[in-house]
Amino acid sequence: MSKILIFFIILFSALQSYEIKQTPIKFSQKRVELTKQYIRQHYGLKVEDIKITPQIILIHYTAIEGFKKSLARFESETLPNDRPDINKAGSLNVSTHFMVERDGTIHQLMPLNYMGRHVIGLNFNSIGIENVGGEGFVENLTVEQLLANIFLVNYLKKRFETIEYVVGHHEYRCFEDTELWLEKDDGYRTKKFDPGPSFMRDLHANIKGFKKAPCD
């Protein structure tokens, strides 16, 4: 992305204000209990609730082009049968705190202080932002989504002073040798491409006060 375009993105994002639409996924006591089980199985922690203290903002793409189809992947409380890459790790369905449409519309899907299942090893200390797109593992997120993500990470920093990092899903394994990494199963890893280095480079060029992934 050119320096001129980055300048205009910074200028526009400083003036832009976003409505965060409340679009809750199903999160009954059943999902809470499944989350507790996941925490116990994968992190070795026995918890009374599923509240988190976020230190990382984790950026994703859905690998699906449509918002409704993307949202549908998170609705069920239990994991669908078509996820053989992760279903061996528990029946808790994936979840994320935010989803950003192609036009930059922001949806909050779940409470910000609840743990979602959106990344191996780092769920217990991260807030997930899913961006609609990336089908076929193509880096095709929009400028509108970039602007919305700039707004969101700054908004979240104001909400949670504990947040230090903004990283892409493809960078999650950079944390394996840090105190933030909690996964106990050394065989539970998947290869991720989202949202891609270009989007993260452009995002970091337009935000301040956040650390990059430790191996960056």
Predicted regions located by residue number:
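Sec-dependent N-terminal signal peptides
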Residues: 4-13
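Basic/polar, cationic surfaces and motifs that engage anionic cell-wall
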Residues: 18-33, 135-216
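Macrodomain-like recognition of ADP-ribose-binding/processing modules
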Residues: 18-40, 49, 93-98, 103, ...
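Short, conserved "active-site rim" segments that organize catalytic pockets and cofactor/ligand binding
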Residues: 40-106
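Solvent-exposed, acidic/flexible segments
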Residues: 50-52, 91-92, 119-122, 138-146
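Short coil-to-beta-strand
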Residues: 57, 120-129
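Solvent-exposed loop/turn segments at secondary-structure junctions
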Residues: 63-67, 103-106, 112-117, 133-137, ...
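Short, solvent-exposed loop/turn and secondary-structure capping segments
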Residues: 68-74, 109-111, 121, 178
